A protein has these predicted regions:
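N-terminal interaction modules that seed assembly of large macromolecular complexes
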Residues: 20-58
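A structural signal for well-ordered alpha-helices, especially hydrophobic packing surfaces
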Residues: 19, 61, 65-68, 72, ...
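A charged, amphipathic interaction segment
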Residues: 77-121
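An acidic intrinsically disordered interaction segment
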Residues: 1-15, 66-73
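Helix-adjacent hinge/juxtasegments
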Residues: 57-85
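Short amphipathic alpha-helical segments and their helix-coil junctions
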Residues: 5-27, 91
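A general alpha-helix detector
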Residues: 8, 21, 37, 53, ...
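Hydrophobic residues within well-ordered, non-membrane alpha-helices that form the packing/core
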Residues: 42, 72-75, 115
Length: 121
């Protein structure tokens, strides 16, 4: 675990096929991609650690990250439907995508602190 989780995630996510696989797991199975990336970064761990992490992050992931993602996805078809305002709607969607990314980055920061604390227990 030498690289930060964020750096590790960017490198792994950029590999061929990883992004599409992660997004498929997210869309089809409801997988939290950050949890998946954490598991790859962290390596072997006890079930209790993963359960504790999911319990800690569940409200943030469901309420904030997924909430922003849902809003971003809802706006996408509206860009065409609101053609007279399509540029403004597209800009708003882009801002929400940026907030979603920041929320994921914060989630990963929490995960890194969690891993550091768990490793010392």
């Amino acid at each position: 675990m030498t690289a930060s989780l964020w750096e590790f995630s960017l490198e792994l996510y950029g590999r061929p096929g990883v992004q599409s696989a992660c997004l498929s797991l997210q869309e089809d199975m409801g997988m939290d991609v950050n949890i998946l990336l954490y598991c790859c970064w962290r390596g072997p761990m006890e079930t209790e650690e993963l359960e504790a992490l999911m319990t800690k992050l569940g409200p943030w992931q469901r309420g904030v990250v997924s909430g922003l993602r849902t809003v971003r996805q809802l706006i996408k078809p509206m860009i065409k439907d609101l053609s007279e305002h399509s540029e403004v709607v597209a800009q708003l969607r882009k801002k929400i995508a940026g907030l979603e990314l920041e929320a994921e980055k914060l989630q990963q920061s929490i995960m890194m602190h969690f891993a550091a604390g768990y490793a010392t227990n």
